[in-house]
Amino acid sequence: MQTTFTELMQQLFLKLGLNHQVNENDVYTFTFEVDGHIQVLIACYHQQWVQLFSELGADLPTNDNLFGEHWPAHVQGRLDGKPILWSQQSLVGLDIDEMQAWLERFIDDIEQRKEPQNTKFQPNSTSPILFI
């Protein structure tokens, strides 16, 4: 028997112990603190496609990477003039463990994109640097 979107979300939030809100359109929202806060929205389009969304912030550069390292891809785009990260995959065959892994990769991707560009690599005296 195929799991419905509502059942999948109930199982996910129960397993992760996360507080969440759900609106009248079955959009699930949760916020968590990681050097600030990140809000993730989870929705289901036509009961076929599970979608993840998160607003990234106004100071991020445009990213043209349409295909990511992992499937499902995480796409950086714009919605109402604001940079967002979104991803989607089919509800068919999506189980709780796959949903959790996908959500964790999505959150990791958000954190990496929100990290200030000048702090991504800072060589120090112990960093091996090749001089030619």
Swiss-Prot record:
Disulfide bonds: none
Pfam families reported in the protein's UniProt record: CesT
Keyword Chaperone listed: yes
Keywords recorded for this protein, A-Z: Chaperone, Plasmid
One annotated GO biological process: protein secretion by the type III secretion system
Record has Chaperone as a keyword: yes
Subunit organization: Binds to YopT.
Function: Functions as a specific chaperone for YopT.
Official protein name in the record: Chaperone protein SycT
Gene that encodes it: sycT
